[in-house]
Structures are given as structure tokens and as C-alpha cells.
Curated annotation (Swiss-Prot):
Residues 1-27 form the signal peptide. It catalyses: an [RNA] containing cytidine + H2O = an [RNA]-3'-cytidine-3'-phosphate + a 5'-hydroxy-ribonucleotide-3'-[RNA]; an [RNA] containing uridine + H2O = an [RNA]-3'-uridine-3'-phosphate + a 5'-hydroxy-ribonucleotide-3'-[RNA]. Keywords: Disulfide bond, Endonuclease, Glycoprotein, Hydrolase, Lyase, Lysosome, Nuclease, Signal. GO terms for cellular component: extracellular space; lysosome. PROSITE patterns: RNASE_PANCREATIC. It is found in: Lysosome; Cytoplasmic granule. This is Non-secretory ribonuclease. Interacts with and forms a tight 1:1 complex with RNH1. Dimerization of two such complexes may occur. Its EC number is 4.6.1.18. Glycans are attached at W34, N44, N86, N92, N111, N119. InterPro entries: RNaseA, RNaseA-like_dom_sf, RNaseA_AS, RNaseA_domain. It comes from Pongo pygmaeus (Bornean orangutan).
Length: 161
């Protein structure tokens, strides 16, 4: 059991290490602010199964996203992380708007196993649950479209550690 657990943890870390690479390849749909898109991609897991939850994201992007991590917490809790001290963003060393969660949260990582370019509803994902820390990038809210109760909002899931 120990070798299997160790191997699966290593595999998860390797998959999550690619998160920053995959995240840089997409563009926010125009109907969303960056905070709304963050919430859609990383908080609002519409189903307990990756195959179904990823359909929401894939429909907006019109492609099978290679991987995605859903934090099993609330948007308000992630907003609170934005109040933690600023750190350099691991995925972009020129940015200093990242914040470490300070506590581990349950999460579900979805990794594309079966792409389906012709029919994105047929994309299939492996699902890996874990409890991990996260690093999130935060920016000032969009004053026209984000709710005023959060002046600073999460805009990018930078790293899972």
C-alpha cells in the first residue's frame, strides 16, 4: 500500500505541476470578469464527477481543457486568502500578487484522459481527490461587474502545493 500511495501522490504532484502551463493557454470568455471566471473554473464544481463538471468549462472554451482543479471551499474563503501577505507568483516570477492559502483544503483535480475535439461533451477525465495548500493570484475587482463587497478578488489559481 505504501508504494502505491507514494506513486499516486507523485503522479498527482506531476499533474498539478502542469497546472500553470495549462492555465496560461486559455482565454477568459468575454461574458465573465476574471473573478467570475475563476469562480466558474475552480469553485463551482457543478457535479461531483469531473466528466460532468468539466463540460461547463469546456462548453465556454469550446475545447477539452487538459486539466483543472476544483477547490472544495467557498469563493468568500478564497477572497479571504487574498488578504494574506503578497508573495511572488510561482508561475510568473515577475508578478507579486499571489497569496498562500495557509491551510489545506479538499480539492478535486481533473485530468483529461480521452480528448474529443469533434464533440467536447465526450471528453473524459480522471479524478483525483486530495487535501492541499494553494496559491492564488488576486487583483482589484472589476468595478462595473464584480460585487462591491469584495474589493480584491481571486483571478488565477497559480499553484497547488
Amino acid at each position: 500500500m505504501v508504494p502505491k500511495l507514494f506513486t499516486s501522490q507523485i503522479s498527482l504532484l506531476l499533474l498539478l505541476g502542469l497546472l500553470a502551463v495549462d492555465g496560461s493557454l486559455h482565454v477568459k470568455p468575454p461574458q465573465f470578469t476574471w473573478a467570475q471566471w475563476f469562480e466558474t473554473q475552480h469553485i463551482n464544481m457543478t457535479s461531483q464527477q469531473c466528466n460532468n463538471a468539466m463540460q461547463v468549462i469546456n462548453n465556454f472554451q469550446r475545447r477539452c481543457k487538459n486539466q483543472n482543479t476544483f477547490l472544495r471551499t467557498t469563493f468568500a474563503n478564497v477572497v479571504n486568502v487574498c488578504g494574506n501577505p503578497n508573495i511572488t507568483c510561482p508561475s510568473n516570477r515577475s508578478r507579486n500578487n499571489c497569496h498562500h492559502s495557509g491551510v489545506q483544503v479538499p480539492l478535486i483535480h481533473c485530468n483529461l484522459t480521452t480528448p474529443s475535439p469533434q464533440n467536447i461533451s465526450n471528453c473524459r477525465y480522471a479524478q483525483t481527490p486530495a487535501n492541499m495548500f494553494y496559491i492564488v493570484a488576486c487583483d482589484n475587482r472589476d468595478p462595473r461587474r464584480d460585487p462591491p463587497q469584495y474589493p480584491v478578488v481571486p483571478v488565477h489559481l497559480d499553484r497547488i502545493i
